[in-house]
Amino acid sequence: MAKEELLELDGIVDEVLPDSKYRVTLENGVVVGAYASGRMRKNHIRILAGDRVTLELSVYDLTKGRINFRHKDANSPRPPRTGQPRR
């Protein structure tokens, strides 16, 4: 699929679903299902409810998207760090 065939839209994560899926509300109010891109999974970028994200949507199926960027907001909810440090 060529890059010209993808739509880039911003949205807010409403809900974290099982199996690394997310429910995202776009700026225009449309709710879509999304998953994290491979680069985000590889770099262990955590996506939580309330995060502002950028999605890529195919023009052929506007109900599914791929999250390719999580915006850093000062008011974004972050869990406290507890437990063992990562190795």
Curated annotation (Swiss-Prot):
CDD domains linked: S1_IF1 (cd04451)
Protein name according to UniProt: Translation initiation factor IF-1 1
Keyword Cytoplasm: yes
Keywords: Cytoplasm, Initiation factor, Protein biosynthesis, RNA-binding, rRNA-binding
GO CC annotation terms, alphabetical: cytosol
HAMAP family, per the entry: IF_1
Assembly and interaction partners: Component of the 30S ribosomal translation pre-initiation complex which assembles on the 30S ribosome in the order IF-2 and IF-3, IF-1 and N-formylmethionyl-tRNA(fMet); mRNA recruitment can occur at any time during PIC assembly.
UniProt-listed Pfam families: eIF-1a
Gene Ontology molecular function: ribosome binding; rRNA binding; translation initiation factor activity
Family per record: Belongs to the IF-1 family.
Purpose of the protein: One of the essential components for the initiation of protein synthesis. Stabilizes the binding of IF-2 and IF-3 on the 30S subunit to which N-formylmethionyl-tRNA(fMet) subsequently binds. Helps modulate mRNA selection, yielding the 30S pre-initiation complex (PIC). Upon addition of the 50S ribosomal subunit IF-1, IF-2 and IF-3 are released leaving the mature 70S translation initiation complex.
Keyword Protein biosynthesis in record: yes
Gene: infA1
Region feature (Disordered): 68-87
Species for this entry: Burkholderia lata (strain ATCC 17760 / DSM 23089 / LMG 22485 / NCIMB 9086 / R18194 / 383)
Chain ranges of the S1-like domain: 1-72
Localization per Swiss-Prot or TrEMBL: Cytoplasm
Composition bias, Pro residues: 77-87
Main location: cytoplasm
